[in-house]
Regions:
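Short acidic/polar capping segments at secondary-structure boundaries
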Residues: 16, 91-93, 119-124, 140-144, ...
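Rossmann-like NAD(P)H-binding beta-loop-alpha module
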Residues: 109-136
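ATP-grasp fold ATP-binding core
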Residues: 105-106, 128-148, 170-183, 200, ...
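Conserved N-proximal alpha/beta basic substrate-recognition cap immediately N-terminal to
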Residues: 6-8, 15-114, 119
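Phosphate-binding site of ATP-dependent enzymes
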Residues: 152-247, 263
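A short beta-strand motif that forms the metal-chelation/ATP-contact edge
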Residues: 55-60, 188-191, 268-279
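ATP-dependent carboxylate activation and anion-phosphoryl transfer catalytic cores
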Residues: 229-313
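Protein kinase-like catalytic core scaffold
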Residues: 135, 190, 197-198, 258, ...
Length: 313
């Protein structure tokens, strides 16, 4: 007979028609949570029938339509989140949801891909000229590379895409295209409870001129061991994130999950993104990584139980 589960965990997701085949982690994560005597449930964040109070932990997994309705998502998060039960913490998610967090990490000494945030078409054109000859245009709030393109700096599409983004009520981010991404891709280092779990190499996604390599959004993922300088920058970025969490949000507990995306340049590695909200972990490329994640969730449940017992005493 099975013992009582350590706890019930909601893996926060969205509808299948949004996810498609892009969610590659959740099956293995669910299996390892069950193996750790945890009861997982996939829960769509905008499903009004879900009883969020029935869960011990709410773990953000893949609510990938949030960027189309960010205000609605944040209002939902604020309504259901209870202290210690929503992971990663809502304050961190709110900060990380907008990619302008990169500028704060830069100010803390983390080398980032040069980034300009634009609020008008004129600012976009000036930033494109400065960042060229080849640039990446994206919204500051986005998921799955939506409304993101690699373009020549003088391509008329730069302005038309920027106007669409601005019309959606978002700011525009302009970055130079990093040549090594087209050949070597990016390095993504995944941390669970602040400890490096594994790293993968992500192949190029964007095609010059707009659109995706191969005509559709796909990620070519392979296991990798980063060079020392890349690994050191990932750790530096994590240290800066911990500093932000402590100073701004009084959060001193390690984040349950984080993914640090890095690129290599002639001037050394640079931070491209720090994914603290809804990243893929690519557990299929790293045997044992889903089990490590499940162990971290089990520790959170145990800590939550201790806090509850102390409160009730």
């Amino acid at each position: 007979m099975n013992s009582k589960p350590l706890g019930r965990v909601a893996l926060i997701t969205t509808s299948d028609d949004v996810l498609g085949y892009d969610e590659v982690d959740i099956d293995e994560i669910e299996a390892e949570l069950r193996a750790a005597n945890i009861a997982p449930t996939r829960a769509v964040w905008h499903d009004p029938s879900v009883d969020w109070d029935a869960f011990d932990l709410l773990v953000v997994r893949c609510p990938w339509d949030y960027s189309e309705r960010p205000r609605e998502f944040l209002a939902w998060m604020d309504a259901v989140a209870a202290p210690g039960r929503f992971l990663n913490p809502p304050d961190v998610i709110r900060w990380n949801l907008d990619k302008t967090y990169l500028l704060e990490l830069r100010d803390l000494g983390v080398p980032i891909v040069p980034t300009r945030v634009c609020h008008t078409p004129a600012e976009v054109l000036a930033a494109a000229r400065a960042a060229g000859p080849t640039i990446v245009v994206k919204p500051t709030v986005s998921a799955g590379s939506k409304d993101t393109a690699m373009l020549d700096g003088d391509d008329p599409v730069v302005l038309s895409l920027a106007e669409k983004i601005l019309g959606d009520g978002k700011a525009v981010m302009i970055q130079p295209a990093i040549p090594s991404v087209a050949t070597a891709g990016e390095t993504a280092s995944i941390y669970f409870d602040g400890v490096l779990s594994h790293s993968v190499r992500k192949g190029p996604i964007l095609e010059l001129g707009g659109g995706f390599v191969g005509g559709a959004y796909t990620e070519a993922i392979s296991a990798t061991t980063p060079p020392p300088a890349v690994a050191a920058l990932a750790d530096q970025a994590m240290a800066a994130i911990r500093a932000v969490c402590a100073a701004r949000f009084a959060i001193r507990e390690p984040l349950l999950y984080a993914r640090i995306d890095l690129v290599e340049t002639p001037a050394g590695p640079k931070l491209l993104e720090a994914e603290l909200f809804e990243p893929s972990y690519f557990v299929g490329q790293a045997p044992g990584s889903a089990a490590r994640f499940a162990s971290c969730v089990a520790r959170r449940l145990a800590t939550l139980g201790e806090r509850t017992s102390s409160t009730n005493f």
